[in-house]
Protein backbone atom coordinates (compact mmCIF):
# COMPACT_ATOMS: atom_id res chain seq x y z
CA UNK A 1 0.00 0.00 0.00
CA UNK A 2 1.38 3.40 -0.97
CA UNK A 3 2.13 5.85 1.81
CA UNK A 4 -0.40 8.63 2.39
CA UNK A 5 0.74 11.97 1.00
CA UNK A 6 1.36 14.56 3.72
CA UNK A 7 1.47 18.35 3.41
CA UNK A 8 1.43 21.06 6.07
CA UNK A 9 -1.55 23.38 5.63
CA UNK A 10 0.73 26.42 6.06
CA UNK A 11 2.29 25.37 2.75
CA UNK A 12 -1.17 25.05 1.24
CA UNK A 13 -1.78 28.65 2.33
CA UNK A 14 1.30 29.95 0.52
CA UNK A 15 0.48 28.02 -2.65
CA UNK A 16 -3.15 29.14 -2.64
CA UNK A 17 -2.13 32.79 -2.34
CA UNK A 18 -0.09 32.45 -5.54
CA UNK A 19 -2.98 30.75 -7.36
CA UNK A 20 -5.39 33.52 -6.38
CA UNK A 21 -2.83 36.26 -6.91
CA UNK A 22 -2.39 35.27 -10.55
CA UNK A 23 -6.06 36.00 -11.19
CA UNK A 24 -6.68 38.91 -8.82
CA UNK A 25 -4.37 41.90 -8.65
CA UNK A 26 -6.17 43.32 -5.61
CA UNK A 27 -4.78 40.55 -3.38
CA UNK A 28 -1.99 41.83 -1.13
CA UNK A 29 -0.06 39.73 1.38
CA UNK A 30 1.38 41.05 4.63
CA UNK A 31 3.75 39.30 6.99
CA UNK A 32 5.53 40.07 10.25
CA UNK A 33 9.09 38.90 9.62
CA UNK A 34 8.02 35.25 9.30
CA UNK A 35 7.47 34.82 5.56
CA UNK A 36 9.65 31.72 5.42
CA UNK A 37 7.75 30.01 8.21
CA UNK A 38 4.23 31.10 7.24
CA UNK A 39 5.06 30.21 3.62
CA UNK A 40 4.00 33.60 2.30
CA UNK A 41 7.54 33.67 0.89
CA UNK A 42 6.09 31.51 -1.89
CA UNK A 43 3.86 34.45 -2.83
CA UNK A 44 6.65 36.97 -2.23
CA UNK A 45 8.86 35.21 -4.77
CA UNK A 46 6.22 35.50 -7.50
CA UNK A 47 4.71 38.87 -6.56
CA UNK A 48 7.32 40.85 -4.59
CA UNK A 49 5.53 44.13 -5.27
CA UNK A 50 2.39 42.82 -3.53
CA UNK A 51 4.11 41.40 -0.46
CA UNK A 52 4.63 43.73 2.50
CA UNK A 53 6.87 42.73 5.40
CA UNK A 54 5.78 44.77 8.40
CA UNK A 55 8.55 43.49 10.65
CA UNK A 56 8.00 42.15 14.15
CA UNK A 57 4.99 44.41 14.69
CA UNK A 58 1.86 42.29 14.40
CA UNK A 59 -0.48 44.96 15.73
CA UNK A 60 0.78 47.45 13.19
CA UNK A 61 0.42 44.81 10.47
CA UNK A 62 -3.27 44.45 11.29
CA UNK A 63 -3.66 48.22 11.13
CA UNK A 64 -1.94 48.34 7.75
CA UNK A 65 -4.19 45.53 6.52
CA UNK A 66 -7.25 47.44 7.70
CA UNK A 67 -6.08 50.54 5.86
CA UNK A 68 -5.47 48.60 2.66
CA UNK A 69 -8.97 47.12 2.89
CA UNK A 70 -10.47 50.61 2.90
CA UNK A 71 -8.79 51.28 -0.46
CA UNK A 72 -10.30 48.22 -2.14
CA UNK A 73 -7.40 45.84 -1.66
CA UNK A 74 -7.93 42.34 -0.23
CA UNK A 75 -5.16 41.97 2.35
CA UNK A 76 -4.05 38.65 3.83
CA UNK A 77 -2.24 39.39 7.10
CA UNK A 78 -0.03 36.48 8.10
CA UNK A 79 1.78 35.37 11.24
CA UNK A 80 1.89 32.57 13.80
CA UNK A 81 -1.48 32.04 15.52
CA UNK A 82 0.00 33.08 18.86
CA UNK A 83 1.14 36.43 17.46
CA UNK A 84 -1.85 37.04 15.19
CA UNK A 85 -4.77 36.14 17.46
CA UNK A 86 -2.83 36.68 20.69
CA UNK A 87 -0.53 39.67 20.39
CA UNK A 88 -2.66 41.57 17.87
CA UNK A 89 -6.08 40.82 19.37
CA UNK A 90 -6.89 44.47 20.12
CA UNK A 91 -6.10 45.61 16.59
CA UNK A 92 -8.08 42.74 15.07
CA UNK A 93 -11.04 43.56 17.29
CA UNK A 94 -11.02 47.33 16.92
CA UNK A 95 -9.45 47.98 13.51
CA UNK A 96 -10.79 45.00 11.55
CA UNK A 97 -13.75 43.49 13.37
CA UNK A 98 -15.52 46.63 14.58
CA UNK A 99 -15.68 48.28 11.11
CA UNK A 100 -16.18 44.81 9.55
CA UNK A 101 -13.37 45.29 7.05
CA UNK A 102 -12.49 42.85 4.30
CA UNK A 103 -9.28 41.56 5.90
CA UNK A 104 -8.16 37.93 5.90
CA UNK A 105 -5.90 36.64 8.67
CA UNK A 106 -3.68 33.66 7.89
CA UNK A 107 -2.61 32.20 11.23
CA UNK A 108 -0.05 29.43 10.95
CA UNK A 109 1.68 27.25 13.57
CA UNK A 110 -1.57 26.77 15.49
CA UNK A 111 -2.07 24.19 18.22
CA UNK A 112 0.08 21.69 20.07
CA UNK A 113 1.59 20.33 16.83
CA UNK A 114 3.92 23.33 16.62
CA UNK A 115 6.18 20.91 18.47
CA UNK A 116 9.63 21.91 19.63
CA UNK A 117 8.85 25.65 19.78
CA UNK A 118 7.04 24.88 23.02
CA UNK A 119 4.25 26.37 25.11
CA UNK A 120 4.95 30.01 24.26
CA UNK A 121 4.29 29.33 20.58
CA UNK A 122 1.63 26.60 20.81
CA UNK A 123 -1.55 28.63 20.49
CA UNK A 124 -4.46 26.59 21.83
CA UNK A 125 -6.59 29.65 22.53
CA UNK A 126 -6.97 31.39 19.17
CA UNK A 127 -10.34 29.98 18.14
CA UNK A 128 -11.82 31.07 21.47
CA UNK A 129 -10.46 34.59 21.02
CA UNK A 130 -11.68 34.94 17.43
CA UNK A 131 -15.13 33.44 18.18
CA UNK A 132 -15.85 36.38 20.45
CA UNK A 133 -15.34 38.97 17.71
CA UNK A 134 -18.75 39.75 16.13
CA UNK A 135 -18.89 38.89 12.44
CA UNK A 136 -15.55 37.06 12.34
CA UNK A 137 -15.55 33.93 10.17
CA UNK A 138 -13.27 31.14 11.42
CA UNK A 139 -11.93 28.38 9.17
CA UNK A 140 -9.77 25.44 10.27
CA UNK A 141 -9.08 23.18 7.26
CA UNK A 142 -8.33 19.47 7.57
CA UNK A 143 -5.85 18.91 4.74
CA UNK A 144 -4.09 20.47 1.76
CA UNK A 145 -7.03 20.20 -0.63
CA UNK A 146 -9.42 21.77 1.85
CA UNK A 147 -6.93 24.45 2.90
CA UNK A 148 -6.37 25.72 -0.63
CA UNK A 149 -10.10 25.73 -1.29
CA UNK A 150 -10.67 27.56 2.00
CA UNK A 151 -8.23 30.33 1.12
CA UNK A 152 -10.07 30.87 -2.17
CA UNK A 153 -13.41 30.93 -0.34
CA UNK A 154 -12.01 33.45 2.12
CA UNK A 155 -10.90 35.69 -0.73
CA UNK A 156 -14.37 35.58 -2.27
CA UNK A 157 -16.15 36.27 1.02
CA UNK A 158 -16.54 39.97 1.83
CA UNK A 159 -15.69 40.51 5.48
CA UNK A 160 -13.11 39.49 8.10
CA UNK A 161 -11.92 35.88 8.06
CA UNK A 162 -9.55 34.06 10.42
CA UNK A 163 -7.88 31.00 8.90
CA UNK A 164 -5.97 28.48 11.01
CA UNK A 165 -3.07 26.51 9.53
CA UNK A 166 -0.59 24.01 10.95
CA UNK A 167 3.14 23.46 10.93
CA UNK A 168 2.97 19.65 10.91
CA UNK A 169 2.65 17.82 7.59
CA UNK A 170 -0.66 15.93 7.74
CA UNK A 171 -2.36 13.36 5.47
CA UNK A 172 -4.17 14.55 2.35
CA UNK A 173 -7.41 12.58 2.23
CA UNK A 174 -9.77 14.78 0.20
CA UNK A 175 -10.03 14.17 -3.55
CA UNK A 176 -9.26 17.45 -5.31
CA UNK A 177 -11.20 16.42 -8.41
CA UNK A 178 -14.47 16.16 -6.49
CA UNK A 179 -13.98 18.30 -3.39
CA UNK A 180 -16.11 21.42 -2.97
CA UNK A 181 -15.73 23.87 -0.09
CA UNK A 182 -18.88 25.53 1.21
CA UNK A 183 -18.43 28.15 3.88
CA UNK A 184 -20.37 27.36 7.04
CA UNK A 185 -21.31 23.82 6.00
CA UNK A 186 -19.99 20.71 7.72
CA UNK A 187 -19.01 17.64 5.71
CA UNK A 188 -20.23 14.17 6.66
CA UNK A 189 -17.27 11.87 5.99
CA UNK A 190 -18.72 8.73 7.51
CA UNK A 191 -22.28 7.75 8.35
CA UNK A 192 -23.13 6.15 11.68
CA UNK A 193 -25.82 6.12 14.35
CA UNK A 194 -24.07 5.20 17.62
CA UNK A 195 -22.15 8.43 18.17
CA UNK A 196 -21.52 11.64 16.23
CA UNK A 197 -17.91 12.82 16.14
CA UNK A 198 -17.40 16.44 15.13
CA UNK A 199 -13.76 17.14 14.31
CA UNK A 200 -11.78 20.04 12.91
CA UNK A 201 -8.31 20.59 11.46
CA UNK A 202 -5.77 17.80 11.76
CA UNK A 203 -8.13 15.97 14.13
CA UNK A 204 -10.46 15.12 11.25
CA UNK A 205 -8.11 12.45 9.87
CA UNK A 206 -7.36 11.17 13.38
CA UNK A 207 -11.10 10.90 14.05
CA UNK A 208 -11.64 8.96 10.84
CA UNK A 209 -8.95 6.52 11.92
CA UNK A 210 -10.54 6.24 15.36
CA UNK A 211 -13.90 5.52 13.71
CA UNK A 212 -12.32 2.59 11.87
CA UNK A 213 -11.15 1.18 15.21
CA UNK A 214 -14.60 1.68 16.70
CA UNK A 215 -16.18 -0.09 13.72
CA UNK A 216 -14.03 -3.13 14.47
CA UNK A 217 -15.78 -3.20 17.87
CA UNK A 218 -19.22 -2.93 16.28
CA UNK A 219 -19.63 0.79 17.03
CA UNK A 220 -20.81 2.86 14.08
CA UNK A 221 -19.53 6.41 14.45
CA UNK A 222 -20.70 9.27 12.29
CA UNK A 223 -17.74 11.56 11.51
CA UNK A 224 -18.32 15.18 10.53
CA UNK A 225 -15.64 17.57 9.36
CA UNK A 226 -16.32 21.04 10.74
CA UNK A 227 -13.97 23.20 8.69
CA UNK A 228 -15.93 26.36 9.46
CA UNK A 229 -16.22 26.87 13.19
CA UNK A 230 -17.97 30.21 12.81
CA UNK A 231 -20.58 30.35 11.46
CA UNK A 232 -21.20 26.82 12.74
CA UNK A 233 -23.40 24.43 10.78
CA UNK A 234 -25.99 24.32 13.57
CA UNK A 235 -28.54 22.45 11.47
CA UNK A 236 -26.12 19.56 10.93
CA UNK A 237 -25.05 19.58 14.59
CA UNK A 238 -28.62 19.27 15.85
CA UNK A 239 -29.64 16.71 13.22
CA UNK A 240 -26.62 14.52 14.02
CA UNK A 241 -27.30 14.74 17.76
CA UNK A 242 -30.89 13.64 17.22
CA UNK A 243 -29.72 10.72 15.10
CA UNK A 244 -26.88 9.51 17.34
CA UNK A 245 -27.96 10.62 20.86
CA UNK A 246 -24.34 11.13 21.95
CA UNK A 247 -21.81 13.63 20.62
CA UNK A 248 -18.01 13.90 20.69
CA UNK A 249 -15.98 16.94 19.60
CA UNK A 250 -12.29 16.67 18.70
CA UNK A 251 -9.97 19.62 18.22
CA UNK A 252 -6.32 20.61 18.49
CA UNK A 253 -7.29 23.54 20.69
CA UNK A 254 -8.32 24.13 24.27
CA UNK A 255 -11.56 22.41 25.23
CA UNK A 256 -12.57 25.87 26.49
CA UNK A 257 -13.99 28.21 23.86
CA UNK A 258 -13.32 26.21 20.70
CA UNK A 259 -15.31 23.75 18.58
CA UNK A 260 -16.51 21.82 21.61
CA UNK A 261 -17.90 24.95 23.22
CA UNK A 262 -19.56 26.03 19.97
CA UNK A 263 -21.26 22.64 19.60
CA UNK A 264 -22.34 22.66 23.24
CA UNK A 265 -23.78 26.17 22.89
CA UNK A 266 -25.86 24.97 19.96
CA UNK A 267 -27.08 21.78 21.61
CA UNK A 268 -27.91 23.48 24.92
CA UNK A 269 -30.21 25.85 23.07
CA UNK A 270 -31.76 23.36 20.66
CA UNK A 271 -31.37 19.72 21.70
CA UNK A 272 -29.60 18.95 25.00
CA UNK A 273 -27.31 15.98 24.40
CA UNK A 274 -24.44 14.30 26.29
CA UNK A 275 -21.18 15.68 24.86
CA UNK A 276 -17.57 14.56 25.30
CA UNK A 277 -15.07 17.30 24.45
CA UNK A 278 -11.66 16.02 23.35
CA UNK A 279 -8.93 18.62 23.02
CA UNK A 280 -6.19 20.26 25.01
CA UNK A 281 -7.35 20.37 28.62
CA UNK A 282 -6.88 23.51 30.72
CA UNK A 283 -3.07 23.29 30.50
CA UNK A 284 -0.13 24.75 28.61
CA UNK A 285 1.81 22.68 26.11
CA UNK A 286 5.50 21.79 26.15
CA UNK A 287 8.44 21.34 23.83
CA UNK A 288 8.77 18.05 21.97
CA UNK A 289 8.31 16.32 18.60
CA UNK A 290 4.87 17.20 17.23
CA UNK A 291 3.67 13.63 16.71
CA UNK A 292 4.66 12.70 20.26
CA UNK A 293 2.87 15.73 21.67
CA UNK A 294 -0.32 14.92 19.76
CA UNK A 295 -0.24 11.49 21.38
CA UNK A 296 0.71 12.74 24.87
CA UNK A 297 -2.15 15.21 24.91
CA UNK A 298 -4.61 12.54 23.82
CA UNK A 299 -5.30 13.80 20.31
CA UNK A 300 -4.14 10.81 18.23
CA UNK A 301 -6.52 8.22 16.77
CA UNK A 302 -5.88 5.60 19.44
CA UNK A 303 -6.52 8.07 22.26
CA UNK A 304 -9.72 9.25 20.60
CA UNK A 305 -10.86 5.64 20.21
CA UNK A 306 -10.18 4.90 23.89
CA UNK A 307 -12.00 8.01 25.11
CA UNK A 308 -15.04 7.42 22.90
CA UNK A 309 -15.27 3.78 24.06
CA UNK A 310 -15.27 4.92 27.69
CA UNK A 311 -17.85 7.62 26.92
CA UNK A 312 -20.22 5.10 25.35
CA UNK A 313 -19.79 2.47 28.06
Stretch-by-stretch model annotation:
Residues 1-164, 169, ...:
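Thiamine diphosphate
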Amino acid sequence: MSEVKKIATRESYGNALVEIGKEHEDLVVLDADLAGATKTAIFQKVFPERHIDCGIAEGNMMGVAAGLATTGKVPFASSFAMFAAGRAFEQIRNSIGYPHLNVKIGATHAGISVGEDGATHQCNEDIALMRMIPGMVIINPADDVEARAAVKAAYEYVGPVYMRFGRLAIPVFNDESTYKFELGKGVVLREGSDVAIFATGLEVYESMQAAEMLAADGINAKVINIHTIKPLDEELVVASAKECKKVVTVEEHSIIGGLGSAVCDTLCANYPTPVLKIGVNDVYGESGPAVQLVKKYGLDAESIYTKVRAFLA
